[in-house]
Structure formats: structure tokens, C-alpha cells
Amino acid sequence: MGIKLFKPTTPSRRNMSANTFEEITTDKPEKSLLVSLKRTGGRNSQGKITVRHRGGGAKRKYRIIDFKRDKDGIPAKVATIEYDPNRTAFIALVVYTDGEKRYIIAPQGLKVGDVIVSGPDADIKAGNCLPIKNIPVGTFVHNIELASGKGAQLVRSAGGSAQLMAKEGNYATIKLPSGETRYVRIECRATIGTVSNVKHEIMSIGKAGRKRKMGFRPTVRGSAMNPCDHPHGGGEGRTPIGMSSPVTPWGKPALGYKTRKTKKYSDRLIIKRKND
């Protein structure tokens, strides 16, 4: 993939960059795998804002992605590589030999015409999905399950890959992109390779309008508000926030305050936290 850099014809264009989408082969998605996506604008069923800075954006349809990869032993041929507005990674439309069509997260290097397969007997090749117990130690994987048969939950975004570090007993040790090292059951499935669109993280949005088209509204600083709207608000001119450490709009500690439960069930499965 390539990154397009724009000439500084306007102030917003100066540091703007965009994807060239060289891997994309079609702009027409498979209609049978599309469903309507209702926008909430960050509101709950009572109409109250529960997630700030959401709203607007371009209309989009949701692409049904096969995260389970449970069609074992049946080869599938890659028909197209497509853009998905709902995620940072590209997706691939695969057609099985029995005629069924499914979308999968496209790994880096997957091309139209490639054949992929799922199941314990699959080869160690990008795009193939196997139980972790059948994957060699040291292999880079993505789309990792946390519970067998539930579907992939880890390492699904653009450019992501985890490394299989060890296998012992019923558990495998996996190093995640965040730096966290944790145990995963060896019956859980993972897909070989790295997620596509690896240069996504170095792209610069460049201007506010592109962010609005993505469905994000502006984030206003608390110190720019009135005291009735935020604990940091008020004061004459540009004043400090007037407290020892920053807080959220609701008065809870912010920036550095640990929000993870101290006795979470998965603590025993995490060997090394990403911040350690």
C-alpha cells in the first residue's frame, strides 16, 4: 500500500496524507453481506448522551465479517479486496467451493485469486485459520479468539499482529501488539499473518472536516468552558485549572488514574501488562 502526500495548497493540506488504496480491487460490496447501520449519535434509549463527541458522518452499511472461520476443510478463493468504512483494516470477499460467500479481515499480502482454508490441517500460510495448538511457536498471527468458537476478539485492526511465544499444557503464551503478554487456550483459533493496511498509523487526518465525515464531533477543552459545564472552567483569561490534578467533566480523576478492576477474572491470564 502507499501513502499520498498533498502539496500545501491550503493550511489544512500542508500536513495531510491519505491512503492510495492500491490493494482495493472493487468499490461495489457484496449486497447479500450488507445490513443497515443505525446511527445513535452517542445517545442511549432515553436520548441522553452517553458517549461524547459522536454524531453526523457519512452514511454507511455494515459488512458482515466472518470472525469464526468455522467452515473447515473447504477451500475458498479470494474474489475481491475491499474497503470497509467500519474498520481500519481492508476486507476480502472469499467464495467457497460450495458457492457460499463470506467477508474476512484481509491479511497483508493476500491477493485476488489466492486460496485460503480453515481447520486444524490447514497450511501455515497467510489467511489460513487454525487452532493455536496447530500453529508453530514464533508465528505471527491475528484475529485471535479468547473463547473457543466465540469468534476472533483480539488483533483485528490495521497492521496488527501478535506473536505466539510458547505452548504449555492447555494454554499458549501470546505477545500482543500493545506489549501485553497473556495466556490463551490452545483450542482457540487464530489466523496466520499480519492485518492489512499496515501504514494506517502514519496517516495524518490533516483537517477537521475529514474527522467530521467519520462521525466525530469536536472535543472542547474543559478550561475553555464555564464552571457550570466543567470543573476546569471559569476564571479570568487563560487561567490554570485550579486543582492539583485534572478531572473529568463529572469530577473523577483523569490522566493516569487506573480504571481497570482490581480483581478482574482475566488477571490470572495476563503475564505482563502493557504498562509494566
UniProtKB/Swiss-Prot annotation:
A GO term for molecular function: transferase activity
Coiled coil: none
Lineage: superkingdom: Bacteria
BP GO terms, sorted: cytoplasmic translation
Pfam families xrefs: Ribosomal_L2 (PF00181), Ribosomal_L2_C (PF03947)
Keyword list, A-Z: Ribonucleoprotein, Ribosomal protein, RNA-binding, rRNA-binding
Chain positions covered by the region annotation Disordered: 218-255
A cellular component term, taken from the record's GO annotations: large ribosomal subunit
Gene3D superfamilies assigned: 2.30.30.30, Nucleic acid-binding proteins (2.40.50.140), Ribosomal protein L2, domain 3 (4.10.950.10)
Similarity comment: Belongs to the universal ribosomal protein uL2 family.
Subunit structure: Part of the 50S ribosomal subunit. Forms a bridge to the 30S subunit in the 70S ribosome.
Task performed by this protein: One of the primary rRNA binding proteins. Required for association of the 30S and 50S subunits to form the 70S ribosome, for tRNA binding and peptide bond formation. It has been suggested to have peptidyltransferase activity; this is somewhat controversial. Makes several contacts with the 16S rRNA in the 70S ribosome.
PANTHER family given in the database record: LARGE RIBOSOMAL SUBUNIT PROTEIN UL2M, RIBOSOMAL PROTEIN L2
Protein name per UniProt: Large ribosomal subunit protein uL2
Taxonomic source organism: Clostridium tetani (strain Massachusetts / E88)
Primary gene name: rplB
